[in-house]
């Protein structure tokens, strides 16, 4: 647990890795994943195709990071612990759900490996799950890991960091107290209050038709084409006139949602029935998986394995790599030694007394 070791390429142990969006963002900034895990077979195949044979297909509840000697020590533990139980789209069993409780396995990996830092990702719904008790418990669990971690959660909108998609996610960044590295979340780089404008869906999709991988078009019914002809750029099902025979009462607003070319896309989702794919404009059709991958900021040489539906799931579940690169850059001095250590204990004690709301506001106020 040396605090002075200088690392050229900080090493990552990645769990709940999916196809590797979070890892890719860190790799693009000079980090290297040396061990990874997921239980979804095709996501593991995609990860392996892009990062090499460092990922292990196994149920994380069957892995003991304290005794499994095949899991190496690392500089960073990262992962997006399963989010379905915390999503604002569905009901929120949160900590009472079998998936929500999996975050504790993430905490066990941090406890076993004692990395200098960890990054955990989850959906915005985590902020309100179990009436706010879920995130409070998660923070306390992370803070209690010896020798102590300063935990700073922040709600990111990845469109503000160069992703051509409005996508809100909570990132927890924890830094080991004995490093003396006071991590501060990076301020937005894109948008009306930043130095650069949003990267738009139209800009992101330029030339996408030339990409040979994961770019199959999906056949749709003539009725769907007729519905799309009634929906304007950036619109959705609610734009269909209520007196039109194609209108169905009770549809939720993100059904048959078409992109707006001069702004980032709405959130790309992983699954769902008819009308949830996300739809092109001006062409009356669903987005291809490669178009969805572009909107998630994946490069064209990132190849996804599996069926069209399976690839859709991987892309929709992924963390957009471009969205976390600023976090990876901000953490890098911790591993190069290019910082002046400070005593983190006063900050740690101060934040422990804060409510979750106060902590989030405090973390946002210090962004630079």
Question: What label would you give each PLM region?
Answer:
Residues 12-21, 26, 60, 71-90, ...:
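Conserved proline-anchored active-site loop of SAM-dependent methyltransferases
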Residues 66-74, 84-255:
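Class I S-adenosyl-L-methionine
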Residues 25-32, 50:
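A short, Lys/Arg-enriched amphipathic alpha-helix followed by its capping loop at the start of a domain
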């Amino acid at each position: 647990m040396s605090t002075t070791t200088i690392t050229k390429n900080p090493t990552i142990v990645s769990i709940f890795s999916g196809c590797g969006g979070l890892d890719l963002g860190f790799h693009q900034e000079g980090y290297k994943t040396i061990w990874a895990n997921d239980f979804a077979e095709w996501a593991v195949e995609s990860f392996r195709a892009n990062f090499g044979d460092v990922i292990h297909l196994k149920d994380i509840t069957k892995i003991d990071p304290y005794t499994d000697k095949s899991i190496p020590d690392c500089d960073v533990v990262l992962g997006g612990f399963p989010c379905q139980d915390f999503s604002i789209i569905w009901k929120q069993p949160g900590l009472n759900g079998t998936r929500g409780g999996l975050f504790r396995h993430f905490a066990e990996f941090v406890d076993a490996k004692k990395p200098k830092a960890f990054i955990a990702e989850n959906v915005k719904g985590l902020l309100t799950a179990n009436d706010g008790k879920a995130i409070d418990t998660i923070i306390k669990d992370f803070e209690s890991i010896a020798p102590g971690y300063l935990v700073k959660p922040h709600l990111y909108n990845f469109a503000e960091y160069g992703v051509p998609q409005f996508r809100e996610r909570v990132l927890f960044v924890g830094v080991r107290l004995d490093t003396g590295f006071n991590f501060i979340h990076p301020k937005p780089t894109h948008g009306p209050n930043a130095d650069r404008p949003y990267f738009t869906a139209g800009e992101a999709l330029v030339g996408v038709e030339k990409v040979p991988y994961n770019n199959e078009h999906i056949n749709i019914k003539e009725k769907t084409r007729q519905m799309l002809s009634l929906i304007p750029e950036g619109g959705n099902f609610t734009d269909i006139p209520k007196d039109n025979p194609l209108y169905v009462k009770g549809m939720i607003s993100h059904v048959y949602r078409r992109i707006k070319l001069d702004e980032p896309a709405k959130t790309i989702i992983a699954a769902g029935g008819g009308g949830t794919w996300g739809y092109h404009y001006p062409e009356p059709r669903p987005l291809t998986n490669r178009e969805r991958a572009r909107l998630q900021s994946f490069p064209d040489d990132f190849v996804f394995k599996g069926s069209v539906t399976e690839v859709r799931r991987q892309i929709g579940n992924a963390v957009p790599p471009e969205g976390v690169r600023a976090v990876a850059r901000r953490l890098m001095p911790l591993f190069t030694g290019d910082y002046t250590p400070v005593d983190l204990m006063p900050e740690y004690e101060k934040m422990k007394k804060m409510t979750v709301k106060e902590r989030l506001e405090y973390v946002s106020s210090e962004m630079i």
